[in-house]
């Protein structure tokens, strides 16, 4: 079955019993604020261009958000590095196939991500394997923890109210 969403690159995650689930704190759910603004830590919106790399762009944004929240040194993650490695997991390197969010997050948990200055977002290179130096440097920037948010309105609001963004997907037609 083909799950590809035309042109934009998101593929739905299939259920996986190994997912670590996030549950918003009960006390947070009991007192959800009317409004939550996480924008002070949000990076500038990325432009994926004509490449189906939306999951890599969203994951890079979450990484950059988290680094800002932790007051770590400025770092723009390499979206092309993430896109290559999530497609490597899915065995689709030779095509602009899009990817599952889970595989992109899995790749930054296992391999990390190098700076975009080291592996720039040059669409023509999307099939090219990043350099060995990129992989060595990426290990310094591995995701330590990631969890799947239960797709209910209260859990999504609780996640945001707790100060955490989430990587989400939307079909664009």
Functional labels for PLM-detected ranges:
Residues 1-77, 96-116:
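Structured alpha-helical subdomains that flank or immediately precede key functional sites
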Residues 40, 84, 170:
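Pocket-edge structural micro-motifs
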């Amino acid at each position: 079955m083909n799950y590809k969403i035309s042109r934009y690159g998101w593929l739905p995650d299939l259920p996986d019993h190994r997912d670590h689930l996030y549950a918003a704190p009960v006390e947070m759910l009991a007192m959800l604020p009317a409004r939550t603004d996480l924008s002070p830590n949000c990076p500038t919106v990325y432009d994926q261009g004509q490449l189906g790399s939306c999951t890599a762009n969203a994951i890079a944004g979450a990484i950059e958000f988290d680094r800002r929240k932790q007051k770590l040194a400025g770092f723009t993650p390499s979206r092309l590095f993430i896109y290559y490695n999530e497609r490597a997991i899915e065995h689709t390197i030779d095509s602009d196939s899009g990817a599952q969010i889970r595989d992109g997050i899995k790749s930054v948990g296992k391999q990390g991500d190098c700076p975009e200055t080291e592996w720039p977002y040059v669409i023509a290179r999307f099939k090219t394997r990043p350099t060995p130096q990129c992989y060595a440097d990426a290990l310094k920037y591995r995701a330590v923890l990631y969890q799947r948010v239960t797709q209910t309105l209260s859990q999504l609001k609780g996640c945001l109210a707790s100060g955490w963004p989430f990587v989400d997907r939307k079909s664009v037609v």
